[in-house]
Structure formats: C-alpha cells, structure tokens
Amino acid sequence: MKLARVIHRDGTPWYLSDDTEINPDIGTVVQVERKTYKFSGTVAYVVHFPGCVGVKELEVSAFNRYFEFL
C-alpha cells in the first residue's frame, strides 16, 4: 500500500463499499492499493480512508483528479 492525500474536493460525498458516505477534507491522508482486473487489464485504485471500514474504488483518471501520492 502507498500513502496519498486529498488535493481536490467538489463537496459531493463519496459512497463507500459499506454504503456509508464520506466527504474528506483537502489534505486528508489515505492508504491506496493498486488493483488490476485480470480479464480486461483495467487498473483502479482502492482508497482506504482513516476510521472507515468501507473503501472507494476509483479509475486512474478520477484518482489523479482528487489525490496525489506522498
């Protein structure tokens, strides 16, 4: 896993895999896993937020819009 931080937000909450929602502040540090789907080769990032059980999976372009690696 790598660390990243939130660099942009538009105010709309994100829904996590456990049906909770989060609206993190800019600067929030998160853990990130890279996931590659075997069938298609598509790459996604799975974002783990502090204090949350659920995760948010984002395609690379969406991840790059909202996060930067530390």
Residue spans for each PLM region:
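Basic/aromatic-rich interaction segments and small domains that mediate binding to polyanionic partners
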Residues: 7-63
